[in-house]
């Protein structure tokens, strides 16, 4: 049986995906193809490059420290624009280049440069900000046709593909690619499982995060952007998962996109909840 694994987006919650991978490996569940959006693309790409869950966990903590840092120059530009031009003149608070560099460094250690160099079937979605087109970065041949609304690319650096899929609007700057601006894949495809079906997966396990009904009392601009996106993604989720048999919902209590101090806790929850639901998965 060919098994596919789909990892949804969720910022720092992606640490739970790593715990889930650890649990699946311990149960000897072999993953044949994998997809991931946003933080799910970080985990899925590293796993496809044959990094172990333990190695991915350590790298994810490194990512968290780097990408949670706000670019001071961008803050200065933001303040300058608001005061002197009466408008916002930046695309995001973080360029995302640190994420690109770290992923690309790990790829080079495996003698991988572009996503097509990865042997395991891998799919990472991103969205064209200009017209809403879905870009699928894939390790497979470009001639594979998913549908007319998808554009597939396999001749892109894996670090750049992950950076694009993680470019959360307002937080990370869009990625420029051939006169396009690419943003977080979760805007349109937060649970990219159907593509795995088209790859011939007999069984697809999708790991998603339960909707958080509450919101913290003290919120800032970033919190508002993130919460609005979460509401949109959960509405999209109801449409996306129609027809999906194996869904593992991970509970994450009031965790915001960049709450990196919760990485350890989320990893443990992903592991524990996957173990608890193993009877439904097998």
Model-found features: residue ranges?
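Patatin-like phospholipase
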Residues: 1-37, 45-282
């Amino acid at each position: 049986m060919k098994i596919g694994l789909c990892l949804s987006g969720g910022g720092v919650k992606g640490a739970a995906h790593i715990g889930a991978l650890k649990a699946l490996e311990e149960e000897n569940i072999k993953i044949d193809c994998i997809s991931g959006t946003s933080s799910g693309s970080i985990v899925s790409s590293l796993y496809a490059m044959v990094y172990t869950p333990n190695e991915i966990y350590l790298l994810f903590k490194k990512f968290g420290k780097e990408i949670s840092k706000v670019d001071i120059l961008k803050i200065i530009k933001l303040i300058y624009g608001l005061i002197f031009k009466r408008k916002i003149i930046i695309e995001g608070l973080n360029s995302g280049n640190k994420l690109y560099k770290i992923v690309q460094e790990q790829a080079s250690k495996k003698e991988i440069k572009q996503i097509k160099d990865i042997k395991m079937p891998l799919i990472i979605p991103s969205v064209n900000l200009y017209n809403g087109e879905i870009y699928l970065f894939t390790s497979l041949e470009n001639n594979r046709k998913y549908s007319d609304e998808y554009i597939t690319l396999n001749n892109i650096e894996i670090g750049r593909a992950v950076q694009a899929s993680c470019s959360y609007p307002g937080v990370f700057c869009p990625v420029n690619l051939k006169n396009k601006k690419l943003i977080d894949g979760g805007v349109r495809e937060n649970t990219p499982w159907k593509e795995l079906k088209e790859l011939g997966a007999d069984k697809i396990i999708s790991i998603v995060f339960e909707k958080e009904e509450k919101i913290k009392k003290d919120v800032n601009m970033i919190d508002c952007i993130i919460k609005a996106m979460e509401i949109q993604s959960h509405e999209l989720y109801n449409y996306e998962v129609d027809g999906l048999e194996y869904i593992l919902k991970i509970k994450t209590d009031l965790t915001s996109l960049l709450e990196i101090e919760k990485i350890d806790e989320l990893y443990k929850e992903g592991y524990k909840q996957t173990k608890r639901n193993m009877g439904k998965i097998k």
